Amino acid sequence: MIRKFFEEKNIPGEIYQSDWKGFGDHAGKIGSRTEAFQNAKGKADYAWVIDADDSVNGQFEFPQNPTADAYTLQFARGEFTWWRTQIFKNNRDWHYVGVLHEYPDSEPKPYKIDKIFGKYSIEARTEGARNIGIDPKEKYARDAELLEKAIQDDPTNVRYHFYLAQSYFDSHQWEKALAAYEKRSTLGGWEEEVFFSVYRMAICKTFLAHPWPEIYDMFMRSYEARPTRAEPLYQLARLHRMHGRPRAAYNYARMALEIPRPTEDTLFIEEIPYSWGNLDELGAVAHSVGKFHLGLQACHKLICENKFPESERARINHNFESYKQIVAKIQNERGVQEMVEKQKQKELKKINKKKHKAYK
């Protein structure tokens, strides 16, 4: 298929074909991605490694004067975005490491990696041969089995432990996911992985209906681990609202709104809180604490930015109209009160004027 496409489009190049060896290097054997690096080395300034089922959406622009040894690109799937290193300077000995969720590495170290920002994203569609025709939960359950075996061979590999927890979570094995995330959180290492592990522990405890103090404590632990991330506060606002505690929900929503979307983090940024969720939570409960103008502003901004799903439009519009009526009533009452006060002042002036004349 690739040869035919190249011929039809008159694209020059070389095609290498070999048996599948796994994604990355493991157990002393090179993986297929490493083999691809070896075949491509020196044949272009940079090499772009991309899965055949992924697609580039938006306006991607490669730097005009590239200087980094590798570039990290923004990925998106569902409600999450993350960064993955995919473009590599082709004069180094790059290789991939790991049986699953492999990562690139190179010698000699150190090497420079930059991010490519812009209005684009790589859509990770997971439509490869090993995923076609099976339920996603089954796919991730299989991944978990592979990672269980990998950990037996390499028990100190923190990346394996993290993605084992991820695979349990994505296959809806909540108890196993909770235990695996807890294990990963104790191993230290990359702060973002530790944060996300503790955050997901709170999510698992929520799904498993653990006592509220445990859930609350875990969300707060994740927030304390990385206070530059708003996701834990968003979840606390949402859960407090759902359980009839609007004042607490308001406080957490206000805190969450003060945290901008992180630009330096690379691991699984949950977009909903930053794009519209925090505003929505504030708009949903501001009336309960008498903050009608703030609720109106939140709903107005939501509607103007229009980042929420269509399924939420009717509810958000209803909240907006309700706030409009309340604020209009308050302003009208204030206007009437101001008129009454002005009239009182006029009457007082008249009385004082008469008293002054009588005194003379």
Predicted regions and their residues:
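Start-of-helix register in tetratricopeptide repeats
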Residues: 159, 192-196, 231, 277, ...
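Short coil turns that delineate tetratricopeptide repeat
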Residues: 155, 189-192, 227, 261, ...
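Structural motif corresponding to the intra-repeat A-B loop/turn of tetratricopeptide repeats
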Residues: 171, 208-209, 243, 289, ...
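"A position-specific structural signal for the A-helix of alpha-solenoid helical repeats
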Residues: 163, 200, 235-238, 281, ...
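Catalytic-site signature of metal-activated, phosphate-bearing donor transferases
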Residues: 24-37, 46, 54-179, 189, ...
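Acidic donor-binding segment of Leloir-type glycosyltransferases
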Residues: 1-17, 251-258
